[in-house]
Amino acid sequence: MKTKMIVVVVLAAMCVLPLSAQVKVGVEGGMNLSHYLVSGSDGYKAEQVGGMKPGFQLGVTVDYEIGKHWMLMSGLSWLQNRSTMKMMDHMVTYFPKTEIKMNNLILPLKMGYNIRVSDKLSLIPSVGVYASYGFGAGNCSLDVIHQEGDNITTEPAKWKPLDGFSYKAGEPNNSGNLQAFRRWDYGGIVGMKAVIADNYTISFDYRVGIKKIQAQNGLRNSTFQFSVGYRF
């Protein structure tokens, strides 16, 4: 419900802006580095395996100039993020290497302040909120632990984060489970955009989720984005 409210607020804000506001529409693309912040409890833990994983994003930007310096910044982007985690179920590492790959549609709403450094360069720091909707990016790989008495083996498997995963982990009646990831996410975003010669842009943003995208292990999105673009 909170995520849907953010979407409604973004759309409403875009509709009620003064007609005199100058609108700049652009396109941008780039790469991101992502991982998950962890706050699991009750035996459900998670750890990042390796460093932050690279992904990509493509999108459309819409900047509304309000007055001399203030700007309302929004748009819509398609972002794919990746991570590899060690996932624990009741303190047992049933999933020592779990690939997580997701596609997301990101809708931000930021307030920016345009600092005109020169006739050819502007810097725009910004802060705001975002809402996103996740959809599948195909099968992901994971390693699963099988235990029969003192014999422990690791076997490869496939899973889809939006569907979750479960399997029989050994005797007697043990099972390993990964809860499905949620589609809707929302959180905060801060950024800096450089506008060169009024048309070319270089942007850096950091997004952090407020909502747990996977409640079982307490995972929240954390993504650094770098983009270059063109404003019409």
Task: Describe each PLM feature range.
Residues 23, 70-72, 121, 194, ...:
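Repeated loop/turn-to-beta-strand initiation elements of outer-membrane beta-barrel proteins
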Residues 52-56, 101-107, 121, 184-188, ...:
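Residues that define the transmembrane beta-barrel architecture of outer-membrane proteins
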Residues 27-29, 74-76, 109, 125-127, ...:
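Membrane-embedded beta-strand positions of outer-membrane beta-barrel proteins
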Residues 36-53, 81-104, 134-183, 212, ...:
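Extracellular/periplasm-exposed beta-strand and loop segments of Gram-negative cell-envelope proteins
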Residues 64-68, 115-119, 196-198, 232:
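Outer-membrane beta-barrel strand-turn architecture
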Residues 31-35, 78-82, 106-108, 115, ...:
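Transmembrane beta-strands of outer-membrane beta-barrel pores
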Residues 21-23, 68-69, 116-122, 138:
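Short loop/turn motifs that connect adjacent beta-strands in outer-membrane beta-barrel proteins
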Residues 24, 220-232:
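Outer-membrane beta-barrel "beta-signal"
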